[in-house]
């Protein structure tokens, strides 16, 4: 009997999905079962991942399958591959391996979806059309080439990246995510941001703690960089760190306390300059043989600030007024040279971040820096010179796009006239009035102040230039800081669509059905939650060697402590999983006919809706012990995608789908005329609800450089209304010939030429010399 059954298996044919028959091979079944069991891991007492099951469990299921095949196919002589897979699932459930069954079943479903990409005619056509567009069209004609504003889709490397992006996105949809998530994205119910990076398991963005990175130097993968010894190398390595980390993430890079991190470089530079100046003066005066220069060097090495009383050197110069004067002169020159070097370092930093490329050379890093609160002499020198270098612009006077600088405003530090850094706040306003940057964050906003500890800059909330914010950590209540962490991924909900279906805009009802609205919103949030968790599992399945700079160099806190084969869950759990939304204004118009700037009723409802979303995110955090946050989505590209689909479904609805975009997040619509104060008062309460990130913009007309006081008054209004992060947009013209930046009407105020007119070489030279 046994021999007969063995003979049966030897003659048994397996029918593949394409109808082809192959000889039965039991080892393939064993391998498939083993993969299912291996996908389930447990943690030991040290938190290390170990296999939950052993070979006995695998063998138990395998032998059961073989017996069933022998029993059920004695006469047929053939068996379909789907039947074998059904048997495996059935036996896993029957024997109580529910977790293995779940993973095996989900993997099988994903494999089926991936096959559809290549065997489903409609999907194949759509995929090939996307590839065709990349190869034959310019960025002006093809949306895919414009998806990332920081990538030039018309360059060779930019196009290469877009090819990879298109294939990766389709692979993610067909193989890595459940069908319900990809369908919700394609239908326009949700938008999964940076889907093309999902297969790689990258995280979004990062707040880089440069002090930890600089302490013993770091490696970019092609060589080790020593600990920096002066401000020039500090700024150079800061740019290199940003560039290197950009290659390990799909979002932007931010530095939460740039002034604090650069300050030690200023002190090191000053000590070098001070030693050199004293040596040169003593040498010039033939006094080296009478003064113990080694003692002077030792005293200088003890300094912990560039501000000190020269009398500390009195035991060296004693009663000699001439030598004391040498010390004073050396100090003055050392300060001057240090200040000049710091300016050059900041200038180089700005130029580097606008010229150095990452990601196969297709883009410059999306970089942000937070600064403004370091009151030390060294920190103040960094802040001042960074602002001055921003004010000067790039090589031909262009306004630098990167880094997006964010000036942190804080009472007692820089907000009031008596505050030590008040002069730097004034300078920040002046520079922003000309160059659009810096933006301004407000540490006194209640939701930011809650984390602030005086004297501990690590408790100051840092923002990304794009608005992302990360502070609280439900997984570690003793470490509520920004640095060394980042956002994992975020997905946005099409809020107007839910509102259209349940509001009065379609004239199907006289009053909005809010009960069903909240039910649909809750269901959609649950869907996004599950999608974020699915992506989180992909991220956690990676290893430290997949992200050599982010993890192996310890940019993500404790990443350097991982072993090569460790999974990433214990680190990534400190990041944020973020739900976003778009078009609150259109949602309110769809529900009740007015948006939040038009009526108090609409504002009340708007806060209720976003409050509902925030509360649900907080509940997710408690349920999963992960940082679920709510972001006011930065949706410059997404806003057009959603409304385009909704317009096709519902037609043009006045105030809802009658424009080419949905209004960004909770913003008051740009077309709505209202006062600055009213706009800020309407938007401010939403900052408190969107703990994952937010920003409010104010648009100003005219030349703001001629009225910096008015510009500053808007910043103060932001602070007083409770805004967390704000920016002012205003027109900026630039004369390409003489480089003037400001408002240009008919005649350039600087060189006097009209549009199209030449300007003499002599005048240009005089203007250039005036700027030196």
Regions found by a protein language model. Give the residues of each.
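Charged, amphipathic alpha-helical regulatory modules used
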Residues: 2-134
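Core structural elements
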Residues: 60-61, 87-93, 548-559, 563, ...
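Solvent-exposed, amphipathic alpha-helical segments
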Residues: 64, 68-72, 496-504, 590
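Conserved catalytic cores of very large enzyme subunits
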Residues: 110-573, 594-595, 599-772
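Well-ordered alpha-helical scaffold segments within catalytic/enzyme domains
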Residues: 586-594
């Amino acid at each position: 009997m046994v021999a007969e059954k063995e003979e049966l298996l030897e003659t048994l044919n397996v029918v593949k999905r394409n109808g082809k028959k192959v000889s039965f091979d039991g080892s393939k079944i064993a391998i498939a079962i083993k993969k299912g069991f291996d996908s389930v891991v447990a943690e030991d007492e040290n938190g290390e991942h170990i296999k939950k099951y052993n070979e006995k469990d695998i063998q138990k299921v395998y032998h059961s399958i073989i017996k069933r095949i022998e029993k059920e196919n004695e006469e047929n002589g053939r068996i379909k591959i789907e039947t074998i897979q059904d048997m495996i699932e059935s036996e896993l459930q029957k024997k109580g391996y529910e977790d293995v069954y779940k993973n095996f079943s989900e993997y099988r479903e994903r494999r089926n979806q991936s096959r559809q990409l290549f065997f489903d005619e409609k999907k194949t056509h759509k995929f090939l059309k996307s590839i065709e567009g990349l190869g034959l069209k310019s960025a002006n004609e093809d949306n895919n080439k414009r998806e990332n504003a920081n990538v030039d889709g018309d360059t060779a490397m930019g196009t290469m990246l877009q090819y990879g992006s298109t294939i990766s996105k389709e692979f993610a949809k067909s193989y890595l995510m459940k069908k319900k998530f990809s369908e919700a994205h394609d239908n326009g119910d949700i938008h999964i941001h940076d889907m093309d990076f999902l297969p790689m398991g990258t995280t979004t963005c990062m707040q880089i703690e440069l002090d930890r990175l600089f302490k013993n130097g770091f490696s970019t993968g092609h060589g080790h960089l020593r600990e920096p010894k002066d401000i020039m190398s500090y700024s150079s390595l800061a740019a290199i760190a940003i560039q290197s980390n950009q290659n390990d993430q799909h979002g932007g890079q931010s530095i939460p306390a740039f002034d604090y991190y650069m300050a030690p470089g200023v002190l090191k530079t000053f000590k070098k300059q001070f030693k050199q100046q004293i040596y040169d003066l003593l040498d010039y005066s033939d006094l080296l043989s009478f003064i113990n220069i080694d003692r002077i060097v030792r005293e200088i090495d003890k300094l912990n600030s560039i501000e000190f009383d020269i009398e500390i050197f009195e035991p060296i110069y004693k009663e000699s007024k001439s030598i004391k004067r040498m010390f004073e002169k050396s100090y003055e020159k050392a300060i001057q040279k240090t200040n000049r070097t710091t300016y050059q370092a900041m200038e180089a930093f700005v130029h580097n971040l606008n010229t150095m490329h990452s990601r196969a050379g297709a883009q410059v890093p999306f970089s942000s820096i937070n600064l403004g609160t370091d009151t030390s002499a060294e920190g103040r020198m960094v802040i001042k010179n960074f602002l001055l270098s921003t004010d000067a612009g790039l090589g031909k006077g262009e306004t630098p796009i990167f880094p997006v600088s964010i000036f942190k405003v804080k009472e007692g530090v820089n907000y009031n006239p008596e505050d030590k850094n008040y002069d730097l706040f004034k300078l920040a306003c002046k520079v922003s009035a000309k160059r659009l940057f810096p933006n301004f964050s407000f540490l006194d906003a209640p939701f930011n102040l809650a984390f602030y500890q005086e004297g501990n800059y690590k408790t100051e909330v840092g923002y990304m230039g794009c608005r992302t914010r990360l502070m609280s950590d439900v997984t570690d209540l003793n470490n509520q800081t920004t640095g060394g962490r980042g956002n994992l991924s975020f997905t946005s909900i099409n809020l107007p669509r839910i509102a259209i279906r349940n509001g009065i805009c379609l004239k199907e009802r006289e009053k909005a059905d809010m009960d069903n609205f909240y039910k649909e919103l809750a269901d959609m949030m649950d869907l996004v939650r599950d999608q974020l968790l699915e992506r989180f599992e992909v991220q956690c399945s990676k290893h430290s060697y997949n992200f050599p700079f982010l993890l192996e160099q310890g940019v993500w806190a404790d990443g350097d402590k991982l072993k090569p084969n460790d999974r990433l869950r214990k680190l990534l759990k400190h990041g944020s999983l973020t739900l976003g939304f778009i078009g609150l204004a259109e949602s309110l118009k769809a529900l009740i006919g007015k948006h939040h700037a038009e009526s108090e009723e609409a504002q009340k409802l708007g806060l209720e809706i976003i409050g509902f979303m925030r509360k649900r995110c907080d509940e997710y955090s408690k349920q999963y012990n992960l940082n679920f946050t709510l972001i006011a989505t930065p949706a410059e590209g997404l806003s057009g995608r959603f409304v385009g689909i909704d317009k096709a479904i519902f037609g043009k609805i006045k105030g809802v789908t009658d424009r080419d975009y949905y209004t960004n997040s909770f913003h008051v619509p740009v077309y709505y005329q209202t006062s600055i104060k009213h706009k800020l008062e309407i938007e401010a309460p939403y900052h408190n609800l969107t703990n994952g990130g937010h920003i409010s913009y104010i648009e100003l007309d005219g030349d703001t450089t001629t009225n910096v006081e008015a510009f500053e008054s808007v910043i103060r209004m932001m602070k007083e209304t409770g805004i967390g992060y704000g920016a002012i947009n205003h027109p900026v013209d630039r004369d390409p010939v003489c480089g003037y930046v400001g408002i240009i009407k008919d005649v350039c105020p600087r060189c006097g030429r009209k549009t199209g007119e030449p300007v003499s070489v002599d005048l240009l030279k005089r203007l250039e010399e005036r700027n030196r």
